[in-house]
Regions:
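A short, active-site helix/loop in glycosyltransferases that binds the activated sugar's phosphate group
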Residues: 1-43
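Conserved donor-binding/catalytic core segment of Leloir-type glycosyltransferases
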Residues: 43-65, 71, 85-86
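Nucleotide-activated donor-binding/catalytic signature segment of Leloir-type glycosyltransferases, i.e.
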Residues: 89-93, 97-130
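Short alpha-helical segment that forms part of, or immediately flanks, the ligand-binding pocket
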Residues: 129, 152-156, 167-171, 177
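Aromatic "clamp/platform" in nucleotide-sugar-dependent glycosyltransferases that forms part
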Residues: 143
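Short hydrophobic beta-strand element within catalytic cores of glycosyltransferases
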Residues: 160-163, 173
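Conserved acidic donor-binding segment of nucleotide-sugar-dependent glycosyltransferases
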Residues: 175-186, 194-199
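A short, well-ordered alpha-helix in the C-terminal region of glycosyltransferases
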Residues: 194, 201-216, 222-228, 232
Length: 243
């Protein structure tokens, strides 16, 4: 049996194939609930002030995550709505260009006090959690993506998410219902402005996104899918209850 995370990754094979999407752990440091005081303490340690709406992208500094495009979109949106930008992440061990991209992003930011560029270690899970929970809008402007589970991590925090319509991100976001899908810098800028200007709509997107993740991308669903797959392999399907 072969397991694929999405239909587009499946192949024509002579053995059975199953689709099992990845999932997030809601009890992990990256996703568990945090107190308001704890969030504020972490923001203070990172040098981020909560006096302005926060637009955030959490991703490694990789051209395919388009951090420069996020910066450009934020600058366009800021002409209409006052806000700050957080670009937080790190480099991947298999991406030697990460340091180059990080340097390029810092140069483009030009010491703007409203831009916070954080090169975080791989263990900074609580910090990422706090940043996301303090954010007003979260972006995942990928130009190319696999499943993109960082989108589900953001949706789990009940935040409105603007993401590139690539890879399996559309499985996680239904446009204008559980998030926003975009294709360009200008489109991203438009939706940043719209969501910051329409908090009730932004809140409804966040609530719908949270429910979508709760129903489809948590560990419990992941375990259920594998148990059903194991039952299929044993050949005894008389006691299988499909939920």
């Amino acid at each position: 049996m072969s397991v694929f995370s999405a239909p587009q990754f499946a192949r024509t094979l002579e053995i059975p194939q199953v689709l099992i999407a990845p999932s997030i752990d809601p009890l992990s440091d990256k996703n568990r609930e945090l107190g308001t005081g704890q969030i504020e303490d972490i923001l203070q340690q990172l040098g981020i002030h909560s006096d302005k709406p926060m637009v955030t992208q959490i991703s490694r500094f990789d051209r395919l995550k388009d951090p420069v495009g996020v910066l450009e979109a934020w600058r366009i949106a800021r002409r209409r709505v006052d806000c700050q930008l957080v670009l937080a992440g790190g480099g991947a061990t298999d991406d030697p260009e990460g340091a180059v991209v990080l340097r390029e992003v810092r140069e483009k930011a030009s010491d703007d006090p409203d831009v916070h560029i954080l090169d975080l270690p791989p263990t900074a899970n609580i910090e990422i959690n706090a940043i996301q929970r303090a954010s007003t809008v979260i972006i995942q402007k990928s130009l190319k993506e696999g499943f993109g589970l960082t989108v589900s991590e953001a949706l789990w925090k009940s935040k409105p998410v603007i993401a590139g319509s690539v890879g399996e991100i559309p499985l996680q976001i239904t446009h204008k219902y559980s998030g926003i899908l975009t294709h360009t810098v200008e489109g991203t800028a438009f939706w940043i402005k719209q969501l910051l200007s329409a908090p009730e709509f932004a809140q409804s997107l966040g609530a719908n996104g949270h429910n979508h993740v709760r129903n489809n991308f948590l560990r419990t669903r992941h375990m259920r899918d594998y148990l059903l797959a194991f039952s299929y392999l044993t050949g005894d399907r008389s006691d299988v209850i499909r939920l």
